[in-house]
């Protein structure tokens, strides 16, 4: 059962759940909290690689990822990031989120943006128990027009679901946690699997 708005506010008040900066009550809806777009992005460079062998030797996968991923792009608040049709880009939420070991989060895109072709997460919308950091967004423009995305705009909504008990291996305590405390648009670390 997901937390309702009253429970989300109570968990925030009690410090069991942390969203920083804390959203105003107007952004806490029936069962979700609206989140905004941060100012950090990462794109794919133009490249000539025919493919990336995701299960190949780790050093080759790492080198291939370094060749195709851009450095992090940091925008001023007044600037826009343009996502063209058929492009994939990474970004982050403005808010940093910390979940306790007995709560899982879910990220959903906004229907109004989806109707323009913007996918906010390609597949990864679960936020693990014990997570702490900004949420990486996997943008894909499936529409026909470039989309101007600006830091601070409403980009998605988080919902929260209590677990039957605290996780034995929450994300923040796992040795293999590749994205612990991320604050930027961190590229894939599949080579660390």
UniProtKB/Swiss-Prot annotation:
Binding site for dCTP: 110-115, 128, 136-138, 171, 178, 182
Active-site annotation: 138 (proton donor/acceptor)
Catalytic activity annotation: dCTP + H2O + H(+) = dUTP + NH4(+)
UniProt-listed Enzyme Commission number(s): 3.5.4.13
Single GO MF descriptor: nucleotide binding
Disordered as annotated region, ranges: 169-193
The keyword Hydrolase is assigned to this record: yes
PANTHER family: DCTP DEAMINASE (PTHR42680:SF3)
Name used for this protein in its record: dCTP deaminase
Organism name: Escherichia coli O1:K1 / APEC
């Amino acid at each position: 059962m997901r937390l309702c708005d009253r429970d989300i506010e109570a968990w925030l008040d009690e410090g069991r759940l942390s969203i920083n900066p804390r959203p105003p009550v107007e952004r806490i809806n029936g069962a979700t909290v609206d989140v905004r777009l941060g100012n950090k992005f990462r794109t794919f460079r133009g490249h000539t690689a025919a493919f990336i062998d995701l299960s190949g030797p780790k050093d080759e996968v790492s080198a291939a990822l370094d060749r195709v991923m851009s450095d992090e792009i940091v925008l001023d608040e007044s600037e826009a990031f343009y996502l063209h049709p058929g492009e994939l880009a990474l970004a982050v939420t403005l808010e940093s989120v910390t979940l306790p070991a007995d709560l899982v989060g879910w990220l959903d895109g906004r229907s109004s943006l989806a109707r323009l072709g913007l996918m906010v997460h390609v597949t990864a919308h679960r936020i693990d128990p014990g997570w702490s950091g900004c949420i990486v967004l996997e943008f894909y423009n499936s529409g026909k027009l470039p989309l101007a995305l600006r830091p601070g705009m409403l980009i998605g909504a988080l919902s929260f679901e209590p677990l039957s008990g605290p996780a034995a291996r929450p994300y923040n305590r796992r040795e293999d946690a590749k994205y612990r405390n991320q604050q930027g648009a961190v590229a894939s670390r599949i080579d660390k699997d």
